[in-house]
Amino acid sequence: MSQEKLIPADQTKCAELARFVVRTTFDDLPEAIAQKAVRHILDSIGAGTAGAIAPETTILTQTLHAAGEGSGAAPLWGRGEKMTPLNAALVNGTASHAFELDDTGGCDHSGAVVVPAAVAALELAGRPVSGKEFITAVVLGYDIARRALEACGAYEPHNGAGFHSTGTCGPFGAAAAAAKILGLNALQTRHALGIASAYSGGLWACVHDGAQNKRLHAGHAAQGGLMSALLARQGFTGPAQTFEEVWGGFNHSYAPTSSDPDAWLRDLGKNWKLARVSIKPHASCRSTHSSIDAVDNLMAKYGFKADEIAEILIIINPFVYGMCGGTAIHPMNAAQLSIPYSVAADLVFGSASLASFTREKREDPRIAETMAKIRFEVDKRQKDDDEPIVQVTLKDGRAFETRVPMPLGSPVNPVTDEALLKKFRSVVGMVLSPADVDALAERLLSLIEVTDVRAEVAEILGRAPAHREVFRA
């Protein structure tokens, strides 16, 4: 294997991606991409700040304190305390994924990985980083992270093999964003991307019991990407062949039967991967959203109410059924990965927002009654990325059917600016004071004009919370 014919280091995909990261400036970004980046940064920071009160975040923070790691200069969002930049990336990344509020369609959850790494890197940049520079770094992070997943043949084959792509692909995006913030040169950035392979990992075993480590995948990826950039800045080397079709390479290891190596560089600088990322309107796995939306759409179109429903049949592909067809409602993580619970919560409480997933809501007797009306038909003819067909039969015998190919929040069916800001204020308001929520929203919405992101945004994230009660998950 050591005798394989190798591509010269400066001609590898890793090297070309590094040069792309270094040479790209804000002026290279289409206006629509820059504006979309502002929305996703707002959404990601909102998710991470809300996640400050998640049980996973609390346990992780307590663990770091117990290990003597409880001090530093980088803010833990919404917690009023600071740790080292590396530990802040770990905690804030974990918090960003803790409530299933984070965006999706990137590496899968690019925002929960890239944004915490980029914010933490501000503490180590040694200079003020403008909003335009920060946006550029984040866009590049989303781009590299998604390219990693597409090089595996896209979401379905890689995740279907048992790998959680947020953890396997995310570190490369975090490394790219951090390298850009830190001002690394092309050689250092190439090494950072290679080093990030050491932090690539994460399995879907958590789907079977709702284990908390799914949340850790985002935090570990954020921390690993930042560490990769810092190591490269100090002269540590990473394998240049990481993205080549060689033994031990990323594609060869994680996608031996589905690899698409050309995806690393395909339409580089033309097809910005942020463009395909979705913002979540519901606090559950994205694979549950089309079923929620389908029922909502049928109710809106035909005017029936939840208590008129006799049965809901969901015709679904085997991949999504295996991931989200379960009926466990405890712990909360399991409920958020359950189509039956998510649809039932939407029907019983009027939405599948975070408030619909508390322990009290999950134990509402109406939930069990409604979930009992939902059944599945697994259709092996459907492709892994096909959205389900939803059939609703009413007690009076009427039946309706629909399929939502692009759930709410997708680029072609986006949430409005008003809805996005409402979500932000709702979830961040669980932690910060109304004045701090307003200040943070104002800074983030005007991020393009900000001259020093650390001073004007990170400072607010480090303020003491107005509410400290841990979310009852």
Per-segment meaning from a language model:
Residues 92-153:
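Hydrophobic alpha-helical hairpins/lids featuring a short glycine-rich hinge
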Residues 1-110, 206-208, 213-473:
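Terminal-appendage/accessory-domain detector
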Residues 123, 180, 300:
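Short polybasic/polar patches that bind polyanions
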Residues 126-133, 150-162, 172-192, 205-215, ...:
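Active-site cavity-forming subdomains of large catalytic enzyme subunits
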Residues 165:
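Active-site histidine-anchored catalytic micro-motif
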Residues 195-203:
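Flexible glycine/proline-rich, aromatic-decorated loop/lid segments
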Residues 138, 142, 190-193, 438-442:
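Short, well-structured alpha-helical segments that form the helix of a local strand-helix-strand
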Residues 111-120, 170-177, 223-227, 288-290:
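Well-ordered alpha-helical segments within folded domains of soluble proteins
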